[in-house]
Amino acid sequence: FSGDKKTALENLPANLISKLKVYDKKSKEEEFTGISSGEKKYVLDLQTKDELNKTWLTNATVGYGNNKKKDLEAQVNYFRKNGENLSFIARSTNRYQNSTYKDNINNSLGLNMAHKFGGKFSLNGHVNYNLNRNGNISSMYQEQYLTGGNQYSASANEGNSKGRSVNSSLLGEWKVDKSTRVNFSGNFGYTPNQNESNSQSASFDAPPGVNHENLFSDFESVPRDIKVNRSENRSRSENESHRYHWAMGVMRRLNEKGTTLGLNIQNSDSWGNNESFSLSETTYFRLKDKNGNDSVLYRNQYLKSPQRNNSWRVGLSFTQPVGKKVRLRVAYNWSTR
């Protein structure tokens, strides 16, 4: 699954797996030159049962419950013993969302492939899409009995969020001949998110006598002489992020001793924009303005913060064996941000 361990572990049925291993895997450059970089890169190795190789496997799950709960999933998998595979996973569920907000849902699609073209060229890649909508409505009424006077307060809140993401990666290796290797990789991601919230609160010095779930829609029916203050707040935010990364490496073994010359090029870019605003209105019923009306405090805020990051890296290395167990490596790296 092109490094997506979560997708593999959560979606592949356990009865398809014969072996599961986690180990530190050498990079293509380390395998070719025999020199370790010292960095740990753990990989998850899943092996399917032999009787399932060269077989198309499909699976569908449908679940419905009370409070409009649902869990729908479909899978198509194809595996071969040499590591080639093709998998498609689709899921739509609100099973794990605790709120009964009408639009709560999590939808996901995933496609993964690994293929070898003869003995010289191989490709691994995946594309994932995810949509998550989550909202909640709540209300509260509170009474406090104090020696200096009782206090009564109520609040109502509604919030919802919508997040989407698209992620993809591609890995390739080309064994040009016994002495030359070309490796390349790339990935990109796009993530837009939206959040909205509305809240109201009020305080009184006597019980308002209105059901707290309908208090703000019937606020005018509350006696004026017991009102202390009322606050209304609205906010909305949107953020959008893009990213991509690509890398390419060429390694050439110059002689039978293992003298190796390597060239690596990498480029990463990410950009995005965060935008938010909030509106607030607070009325003080016990504090009058110069005209004798209730005092009102208004607060309006707007924020916008664009972001951009770009980097390049070019590396050149030379590896020379010195004896059977010793290798000398000289490298030069140039980078910019």
Locations of regions flagged by a protein language model:
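Short acidic/polar hinge/loop motifs at secondary-structure boundaries
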Residues: 2-26
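Primarily recognizes Gram-negative and organellar outer-membrane beta-barrels
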Residues: 5-6, 24-72, 82-337
